[in-house]
């Protein structure tokens, strides 16, 4: 059962991402409204996929990607960046930091589902052990 962490400061956007991915069989979703909250969640629970915005009020998406890639237990966690920043510099920076895919808003449900399916099929069963960490 894929565990997905959806991080965006917009509740509407988080709900839209969840609605787009809900048809993915047996997925379970956790939502975070900031980069700091995302990092807290990532230290508490194992996830199979991280869907992340770049623009957030405290810790930005790039910094969250850098945190994930700096952790041995999280290094293989697939990350989809979903952002309004469609410029090439943002795309390059996100991918260089370690994002798996970069998508711009607006996106279609099919494109997000396809990206998630592709990454989940390639990923190891869990990026972390099932046990919570302290």
Walk through the language-model features, giving the residues of each.
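The feature encodes the CheY-like receiver
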Residues: 57, 75, 87, 106
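Two-component/phosphorelay signaling modules centered on CheY-like receiver
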Residues: 11-30
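His-Asp phosphorelay/catalytic-motif detector in bacterial-type signaling
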Residues: 46-48, 73-78
């Amino acid at each position: 059962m894929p565990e997905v962490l959806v991080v965006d400061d917009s509740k509407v956007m988080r709900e839209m991402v969840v609605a787009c991915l809900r048809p993915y069989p047996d997925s379970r979703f956790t939502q975070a409204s900031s980069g700091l909250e995302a990092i807290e969640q990532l230290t508490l629970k194992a996830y199979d996929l991280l869907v992340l915005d770049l623009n957030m009020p405290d810790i930005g998406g790039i910094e969250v990607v850098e945190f994930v890639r700096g952790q041995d237990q999280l290094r293989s966690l697939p990350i989809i960046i979903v952002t309004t920043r469609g410029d090439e510099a943002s795309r390059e920076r996100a991918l260089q930091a370690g994002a798996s895919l970069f998508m711009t808003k607006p996106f279609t449900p099919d494109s997000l589902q396809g990206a998630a399916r592709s990454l989940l099929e390639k990923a190891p069963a869990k990026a972390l052990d099932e046990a919570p960490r302290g």
